[in-house]
Structures are given as C-alpha cells and as structure tokens.
C-alpha cells in the first residue's frame, strides 16, 4: 500500500513499499537518504514554484538509483525493480499522468477509481 506523504506521491510510496517486500527489507528502513531528497524538493518549491512539492514516481526511482551507489539496501531494492512487472495495483484516485506512465513502464496491471486526487484541477499560471 502507499499514500501521499509530505515527500512523495502515493504511487512512489507504494512502489518503494513493494520493493521492500520483494527485497525482504524491513518496512521502517529508509532506502533513500533525506540528503538526496531535500535538494530535489527545494528545487521544486523554490525554483519551480510548486506550492505542494511532492516527488513523483520517476523522481523517487532516480533518487533510489543515486542512493544505490552508497546504500547496499537501496541497491538490493533497485535490483528487484523488474519483479514489479505483472503486479496488480489499484489506486483510489486517478494517478498523475507522469506516475501513470511510469507505472505502465514498470509493467503494473493498474486500475484506478474515477476520482481525482484533488479538487484543485486548475493551476492558474
């Protein structure tokens, strides 16, 4: 399972949790160091002007790849990424287009409820 956190989207959270299970890693283990995530979030907020900077699934997987260089547990999780292909996944909301594309690339059999994640659909910029 996964849900939006203050750092990442539900699809990203769910994927990390699935990788932990497939890799036999403890759920409480941090696979991506905050020192990797914080600059990305700061960039999205301060430079891109995002008022709700959440890391997408693609950004989290890139961060996991970077972390795998120095974190053996992240490396183990990354090596199990191909095992996600064919997994059944269901979202109670429509995923963002970016997360939806990455889920398809990973091979998820994904279904979604016909509900948007937010009522704030107009960016206004």
Show which residues each predicted segment covers.
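Flexible, glycine/charged-enriched surface loops at secondary-structure junctions
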Residues: 26-34, 88
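C-terminal binding/interaction regions
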Residues: 36-125
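Short, basic/aromatic recognition patches
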Residues: 1
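A short, polar/charged loop-to-alpha-helix boundary motif
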Residues: 5-24
């Amino acid at each position: 399972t996964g849900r939006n956190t203050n750092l990442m989207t539900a699809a990203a959270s769910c994927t990390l949790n699935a990788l932990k299970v497939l890799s036999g890693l403890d759920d409480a283990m941090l696979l991506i160091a905050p020192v990797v995530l914080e600059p990305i979030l700061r960039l999205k907020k301060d430079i891109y002007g995002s008022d709700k900077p959440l890391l997408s699934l693609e950004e989290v997987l890139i961060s996991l790849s970077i972390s795998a260089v120095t974190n053996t547990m992240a490396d183990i999780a990354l090596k199990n990424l191909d095992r996600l292909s064919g997994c059944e996944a269901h979202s109670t909301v429509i995923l963002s287009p970016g997360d939806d594309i990455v889920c398809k690339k990973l091979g998820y059999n994904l279904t979604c409820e016909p509900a948007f994640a937010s009522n704030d659909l107009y960016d206004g910029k």
